[in-house]
């Protein structure tokens, strides 16, 4: 492989082949987006990037702009002269999206080229099968593999009944039971984490996504806040969530047990 350092970020033979047709450009993966400014990881490290004027002009909707997780082609791999330019976006193998803000008809891509989506739902006050079905639909439409993660099992007295209810709408997706408080079920998540694979977490505010990620990392990489005693919900603290998954994924591959 011509770009060995990018392999751990999911740069497969399929992307390498497509990138080979862009003479004079270099592949990179988008790890963060803040309005019109991007962070990308290339063979030599992380850089700040912007979309080229030509790509902006050719864009017909928001889906034609880079999103977190996209593989893009940039004009150089050094940051000595300001932002590098994103010239093209490689064809996405998967993406999940939502309606753009402001009631527009346009669709905004939340994350691209995801292999596995962990759908998190707590077993206490957040338990909602209709919401789970909506998340499942989003996951299947994205072309990624959904995995259902039921959190806060330590706060549930009827786990078996809840599992039966979830199984009735799971469409065959794997189901895992976790307790961040007791670290129960965390090891089961590791079998989905491997070099070159990208995972994402979705779920309602307060279900324990940030805490679960911190458990996987073995340190606090995403902020969490205290649990409200009134309803056992963790106050929402995650920001730029989708962008974090790609920065962390390479590290996850190195902390698998064994």
Regions found by a protein language model. Give the residues of each.
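Conserved nucleotide-binding/hydrolysis micro-motifs of P-loop NTPases
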Residues: 78-81, 91-94, 123-126, 152-157, ...
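A generic structural signal for alpha->beta connector loops
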Residues: 143, 172-174, 221, 251
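General small-molecule cofactor/ligand-binding pocket signal
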Residues: 87, 176, 255
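Canonical P-loop GTPase G-domain recognition
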Residues: 145, 152-207
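Walker A/P-loop
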Residues: 210-211, 215
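Phosphate-binding glycine-rich loops and their immediate beta-loop-alpha structural context
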Residues: 109-172
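N-terminal accessory targeting/assembly segments
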Residues: 1-129
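Switch I (effector-binding) loop of TRAFAC-class P-loop GTPase G-domains
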Residues: 219-253
